[in-house]
């Protein structure tokens, strides 16, 4: 994932900055507790494709 792209992407729900989880290829919105997938180096910024974070995952990402 190109870090210059990360600097301009925000959560489509609340416009918050996103945290890049390189290991799991996810973009995390801590505010909305959503994880957007990255597929073939392309962020999928559709709310319908986002995964709601579990309580354990929320704690992991802070």
UniProtKB/Swiss-Prot annotation:
Pfam families, A to Z: Trm112p
GO CC list: cytosol
Entry-linked InterPro entries: Trm112-like
Family: Belongs to the UPF0434 family.
Alphabetical list of PANTHER family matching this protein: PROTEIN PREY, MITOCHONDRIAL, ZGC:162634
Designated name of the protein: UPF0434 protein Fphi_1862
Organism field: Francisella philomiragia subsp. philomiragia (strain ATCC 25017 / CCUG 19701 / FSC 153 / O#319-036)
């Amino acid at each position: 994932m190109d870090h210059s792209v990360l600097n301009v992407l925000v959560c489509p729900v609340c416009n918050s900055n996103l945290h890049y989880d390189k290991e799991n290829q996810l973009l995390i919105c801590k505010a909305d507790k959503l994880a957007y997938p990255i597929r073939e180096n392309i962020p999928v910024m559709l709310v319908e494709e986002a995964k709601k974070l579990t309580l354990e995952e929320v704690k992991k990402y802070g």
